[in-house]
Every structure is written in structure tokens, then in C-alpha cells.
């Protein structure tokens, strides 16, 4: 039995090494600068302050889609009285004009994009406030058609600036009730990681197709992430990593503040799945951390190694016994 203890220690060592190494994964085609492959389609997203020279913009034939900012938080007030009266009335009127002009620009860009064969999508920037009112605001503003993509944008975890994840659950459920489709989720890595780690708490958010904002040349080791085997859309260019001197991809007719996205598929393939609307399959919740189990098994208090039934010499004075004999670290050499 000396070999038993040595084998146990060896197994513990091997399992510990494997646990620390984690899963081994290869770098898939969509993880390393997929925008450099001319077959992969590109998508531009913009808001009202991004300037676009459309004649030049439409010359880039890799651009397959355009996603525009639609609504932002709760709807604007139609009245500049009451809470808006007094010194803020001029500001209120200015904000309302900005809102009206932004909505008209949204509608104009949609007409231009779809007339020129681009796929169209719209996003709502989630803010603090009633999520059902925000969902209704988005639907009233964007008026999404069956062939258009819908997006909920959660820019971070700070609930003083952005919609909480609990409210986001309510938002997407209400969109589903009113349209028959779920939106996809736009967010950054930290928020996506948190949702994935708490997918039992956020069963809807964690199963929405992921529009992933990450400004690095690759996403090796990121996926699978919870229910997400990969991204649906990868935002790889923004003002954070694009300047006059250096930019991963430049779209003609735009400035360095434009957002550019890639999908690991052709324009034809993208068009077939563009409207989205379904939830991803739910994966089983993770088992307890292997390293914790190993710590308990290999580093815990001294435990019996094994219990065996020891055959004894049976005589009239020593009847057979069924009581197990414990073999432990103190007496294993006796056996």
C-alpha cells in the first residue's frame, strides 16, 4: 500500500496542473483580425454627430450594414413648462429641437441605406429609468421593420449612467412581447463577462446574440463565454483606437470617430440572419471550481485512504466479521 499513497499524490499533482492550465483552445478564423479577410462583411454604426459623405461611403463594397443610434433613455418631454419652466426653458427648447432633428436624420439615413442595398439596424442606449417606457420609446422612435436589426446598448455597469442589468431584462422582454423578436445585446468585455458569470440571474441577457466591443487585434481565449460561443458582431474600430496616423480600418466618407464592425461571414450569409430575434441555447451552469475541489481533496485534513474488508482466519472461537478495517496514513505500512 505504499504505492497507493504515492499514486494519490501523483494524481493530485496532475489534476492541479490541468486545473491551472485551463482549457486548451485554438485560435479560430474569426478571432484574429477577421477584418483583414476581404470576404468578411463589415458594418458601420453611427449616431447623429457622426458626419458621413454618402457618395464616398457607398464606394466601400465591403460595407453590408448600417446600425444607427435611435433612442436614448426616456423620451423627451413635449412641453417646456412645469419642471422645465424658468431659467431652463431655453435649454429645454434647444434639447427638443435637437431631438426632432436627430429623429429626422435617423429616418433619412435609413432611407439612404436601404435604397442603396444596405442592411439596417437601430439601437437604444439604455439609461436609468423605467425600462418599459424606454422600450416603448425605442419602438416609437425606430419603428423597426421585420427585416431590421434591433439592439439594446448597455455601455457599462454604472447604474447612475446606464440601464441596470435587471432593468435590461425587463426591456428585452417587453420588446419581445411587442414585436415577437428579441434584440441583440451590445456591450463591452467586462459587462459581458459579468453577465456570463451570472447567467442564472440574467437568463435573457445572457442568451441574446452578442455585439462585442473590443479594440484589440484578437479575442483569443475570450470565447466560449457563458452561453456565447462567439460574438455575433465585433466592434473593432472606434475613436478609442482610430486616429489620423493609425486606424485598423478606414471607411471612406467618414472621420476617425466612426465605429466599424466585422462579422465572420460574407455579405450574403449575413443578410440571411440579419434580423436575428431568437435566444441562444442555454448551457448548463458551471460545476464547482475544480481548484476548490482539489484543495479539499489534496490539501485538506488527514483522511482515511481506504477502507477494506480484511479476510481473517475463521475458527469456532473467531466467527467471520463484517466490520471494515480502516487503513490510514498511520497504519498503511502494516498492510
Regions found by a protein language model. Give the residues of each.
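Bacterial N-terminal signal peptides that target proteins for export
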Residues: 2-11
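Functionally critical loop-and-helix segments that line ligand-binding/catalytic clefts
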Residues: 30-60, 64, 203-333
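N-terminal carbohydrate-binding/catalytic regions of secreted carbohydrate-active enzymes
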Residues: 37-121
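Solvent-exposed loop/turn segments at secondary-structure junctions
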Residues: 47-52, 70-75, 125-131, 155-160, ...
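Catalytic domains of cell-wall/extracellular-matrix polysaccharide-remodeling enzymes
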Residues: 149-224
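Structural recognition of the beta-strand scaffold that forms the well-ordered cores
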Residues: 41-45, 64-69, 119-124, 148-154, ...
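Alpha-helical scaffolding within the catalytic cores
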Residues: 47-56, 100-112, 129-145, 165-170, ...
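Bacterial N-terminal signal peptides
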Residues: 11-22
Amino acid at each position: 500500500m505504499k504505492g497507493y499513497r504515492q499514486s494519490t499524490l501523483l494524481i493530485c499533482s496532475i489534476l492541479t496542473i490541468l486545473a491551472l492550465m485551463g482549457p486548451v483552445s485554438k485560435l479560430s478564423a474569426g478571432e484574429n483580425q477577421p477584418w483583414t479577410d476581404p470576404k468578411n462583411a463589415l458594418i458601420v454604426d453611427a449616431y447623429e454627430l457622426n458626419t458621413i459623405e454618402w457618395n464616398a461611403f457607398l464606394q466601400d463594397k465591403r460595407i453590408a450594414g448600417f446600425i444607427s443610434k435611435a433612442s436614448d433613455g426616456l423620451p423627451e418631454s413635449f412641453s417646456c413648462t412645469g419642471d422645465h419652466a424658468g431659467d431652463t426653458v431655453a435649454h429645454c427648447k434647444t434639447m427638443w429641437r435637437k431631438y426632432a432633428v436627430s429623429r429626422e436624420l435617423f429616418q433619412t439615413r435609413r432611407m439612404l441605406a436601404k435604397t442603396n442595398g444596405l442592411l439596417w439596424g437601430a439601437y437604444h442606449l439604455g439609461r436609468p429609468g423605467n425600462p418599459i417606457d424606454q422600450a416603448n420609446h425605442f419602438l416609437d422612435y425606430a419603428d423597426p421593420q421585420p427585416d431590421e436589426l434591433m439592439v439594446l446598448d448597455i455601455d457599462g455597469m454604472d447604474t447612475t449612467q446606464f440601464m441596470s442589468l435587471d432593468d435590461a431584462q425587463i426591456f428585452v422582454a417587453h420588446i419581445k412581447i411587442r414585436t415577437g423578436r428579441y434584440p441583440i445585446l451590445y456591450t463591452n468585455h467586462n459587462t459581458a463577462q459579468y453577465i456570463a458569470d451570472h447567467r442564472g440571474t440574467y437568463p435573457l441577457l445572457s442568451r441574446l446574440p452578442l455585439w462585442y466591443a473590443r479594440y484589440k487585434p484578437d479575442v483569443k481565449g475570450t470565447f466560449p463565454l457563458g452561453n456565447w460561443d462567439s460574438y455575433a458582431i465585433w466592434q473593432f474600430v472606434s475613436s478609442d483606437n482610430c486616429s489620423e496616423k493609425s486606424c485598423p480600418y478606414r471607411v471612406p466618407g467618414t472621420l476617425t470617430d466612426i465605429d466599424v464592425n466585422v462579422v465572420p461571414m460574407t455579405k450574403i450569409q449575413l443578410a440571411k440572419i440579419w434580423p436575428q430575434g431568437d435566444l441562444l441555447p442555454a448551457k448548463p451552469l458551471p460545476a464547482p471550481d475544480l481548484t476548490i475541489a482539489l484543495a479539499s481533496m489534496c490539501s485538506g485534513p488527514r483522511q482515511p485512504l481506504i477502507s477494506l474488508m480484511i479476510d481473517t482466519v475463521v475458527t469456532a472461537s473467531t466467527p467471520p466479521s463484517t466490520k471494515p478495517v480502516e487503513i490510514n496514513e498511520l497504519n498503511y505500512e502494516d498492510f
